[in-house]
Swiss-Prot record:
Domain xRRM: 438-551
One GO cellular component term: nucleus
PROSITE patterns assigned: HTH_LA (PS50961), RRM (PS50102), XRRM (PS51939)
Keywords: Acetylation, Differentiation, Isopeptide bond, mRNA processing, mRNA splicing, Nucleus, Phosphoprotein, RNA-binding, Spermatogenesis, Transcription, Transcription regulation, Ubl conjugation
Positions of modified residues (Phosphoserine): 253, 256, 294, 334, 347
Protein name from the UniProt record: La-related protein 7
Location relative to the cell: Nucleus, Nucleoplasm
Residue ranges of the region described as Disordered: 1-24, 180-364
Compositional bias ranges of the Basic and acidic residues kind: 1-16, 286-295, 340-349
One BP annotation, GO: positive regulation of G1/S transition of mitotic cell cycle
Phosphothreonine carried by residues: 251, 260, 335
Domain remarks: The xRRM domain binds the 3' end of 7SK snRNA (7SK RNA) at the top of stem-loop 4.
Length: 570
């Protein structure tokens, strides 16, 4: 009985789990249908070359559902072909075949509409990482959005900051321009973003720019806070100074000590301040002193002439009255400042409250004001033409300056070469370099080492101390290499110094001759031909001009950085 009860309990739990597992696919089915209807819609197929070609390839216009599963947007929704077929059963744009594995358009694709540009608007000043759904939500208030294009950078994948939105009718596009064109005050006056990027080079990420902006803002806030704190501390110090002066009564003996000639001299401003503080301390201590020291005035104060004493007393009285006035003014100012700061704080808080209230009201009403610049695509096309014309003119001027620089450099070289003989020598050298190295016997030295040889430069530097080296044929990590010299005499000079080289570097040297020499010369010619036949990256148009200008700029900077050495006779 117990076993039967356990079995029934297990079955009931399994049924409950099965019921819980029931997936809710209503929203997913709706999203799949919407996405496929968009892909096979007129607006997308006129622009989507790949999908149009796939439809044209098949005889009856059917496309396999597995192709749709390979798309990234469909992967996010589902990878189940049956679920896609289930979602497209009630579609108004596409239809399934009998097996339910392929789909096609119900109506054939017509010609591309002529008013496409008039129905499209250009949008800039978009938020970073903008999405199609966000644009559809914002522009959907003005009409039915048919197509959205958000250009991205190939290297980083970041959006370029602008987009194109196509509406169903011209009126809807005009409405979007009227209601959504609200550019902020900081925005540039002239619309149209035409970002210039270097080909195959990464673009600095948007995060870096954001971080820089944040750092700048933080610095500005810190500076403001510091200035406010400094002002407050200055006010506090001035008020505390006055309070200290009134609290601490200084005796006449302290005053007399300060006025002795032994004390170091101070500037006039400091003296005045000190006198004021002393004066403020004296009147409070006076009342008590009159009672106590009426008879003992002579003991309290140092012996001085009577006239001086009277003058000092008068001065002290005036100073005391001035200080008391100043202290009152300070207190009044401080209270006024506090009141002003309180008023400002209240006003700021009120403004913030009002702003929040308005924002909430807008959200309730659905009137969200977004700082965007919206204009028609035809207007944007005119701006693009203007930009291209400017670019063309600037490139033409750059080309002109490059040609002028070339002419100037040629003129300089002509001035430097006055004799005809030197010119002939140069021409012969150019011909030789064009043809390649000519066969000369006894100029190639083979170097063999027990260990891997150092770099090409190091080997060349070692041999160059004995005679001039033309070329070193060496690959990294090799134990053998070939050194080509200008003349057989140079090669022989190296062979004569073989014993010294062997002691220092443990290299074995040998001059090539006979078949070995001929084979090596053939190898030289083959390697040279292979190098010349290598495919080179062709640079055309603006890219070619910019690279030329960059080379000239680098050459000029190098020339400017060189030291000018004057001879004794200059």
């Amino acid at each position: 009985m117990e076993t039967e009860n356990q079995k029934t309990m297990e079955e009931s739990t399994k049924r409950k789990e099965e019921k819980k597992k029931r997936s809710r696919v209503k929203q997913v089915l709706a999203d799949i249908a919407k996405q496929v209807d968009f892909w096979f819609g007129d607006a997308n197929l006129h622009k989507d070359k790949f999908l149009r070609e796939q439809i044209e390839k098949s005889r009856d216009g059917y496309v396999d559902i597995s192709l749709l599963v390979s798309f990234n947007k469909m992967k996010k929704l589902t990878t189940d072909g049956k679920l896609i077929a289930r979602a497209l059963k009630s579609s108004s744009v596409v239809e399934l075949d009998l097996e339910g594995t392929r789909i096609r358009r119900k109506k054939p694709l017509g010609e591309r509409p002529k008013d496409e540009e008039e129905r499209t608007v250009y949008v800039e000043l978009l938020p970073k990482n903008v999405t199609h759904s966000w644009i559809e939500r914002v522009f959907g208030k003005c009409g039915n959005v048919v197509y959205i294009s958000i250009p991205h950078y190939k290297s980083t994948g970041d959006p370029k900051g602008f987009a194109f939105v196509e509406f169903e009718t011209k009126e809807q596009a005009a409405k979007a321009i009227e209601f959504l064109n609200n550019p902020p005050e900081e925005a540039p006056r002239k619309p149209g973003i035409f970002p210039k990027t270097v080909k195959n080079k990464p673009i600095p990420s948007l995060r870096v720019a954001e971080e820089k902006k944040k750092k700048k803002k933080k610095k500005g806030r810190i500076k403001k806070e510091e200035s406010v704190q400094a002002k407050e501390s200055a006010v506090d110090s001035s008020s505390s100074g006055v309070c200290k002066a009134t609290k601490r009564p200084r005796t006449a003996s302290e005053g007399s000590e300060a006025e002795t000639p032994e004390a170091p001299k101070q500037p006039a401003k400091k003296k005045k301040k000190r006198d004021k503080v002393e004066a403020s301390s004296l009147p409070e201590a006076r009342a008590g002193k009159r009672e106590r020291c009426s008879a003992e005035d002579e003991d309290c104060l140092p012996p001085r002439p009577k006239a001086k004493k009277r003058a000092q007393k008068d001065g002290v009285g005036q100073a005391a009255s001035e200080v008391s006035k100043e202290s009152r003014d300070l207190e009044f100012c401080s209270t006024e400042e506090e009141k002003e700061t309180d008023r400002k704080g209240d006003s700021l808080s009120k403004v913030k409250r009002k702003h929040k209230k308005k924002h909430k009201e807008r959200h309730k009403m659905g009137e969200e004001v977004i700082p965007l610049r919206v204009l028609s695509k035809t207007e944007w096309m005119d701006l693009k033409k203007e930009y291209l014309a400017l670019q063309k003119a600037s490139m033409a001027s750059l080309k002109k300056t490059i040609s002028q620089i070339k002419l100037e450099s040629e003129m300089e070289t002509d001035c430097k070469a006055p004799t005809a003989g030197s010119g002939q020598e140069c021409s012969t050298q150019e011909k030789v370099s064009a043809q390649g190295p000519q066969f000369v016997t006894g100029v190639i030295v083979k170097i063999v080492s027990g260990e891997p040889l150092p770099g090409r430069k190091q080997v060349k530097d070692i041999l160059a101390t004995i005679s001039e080296v033309v070329y070193i044929d060496l690959l990294e990590g090799d134990t053998e290499c070939h050194a080509r010299f200008k003349t057989p005499e140079d090669a022989q000079a190296v062979m004569n110094a073989q014993t010294e080289i062997r002691k220092k570097h443990s290299w074995n040297l040998e001059v090539l001759s006979g078949d070995h020499e001929q084979r090596y010369w053939q190898k030289i010619l083959v390697d040279r031909q292979a190098k010349l036949n290598q495919p080179r990256e062709k640079k055309r148009g603006t890219e070619k001009l910019i690279t030329k200008a960059e080379k000239i700029r680098l050459a000029k900077t190098q020339q400017a950085s060189q030291h000018i050495r004057f001879s004794e006779y200059d």
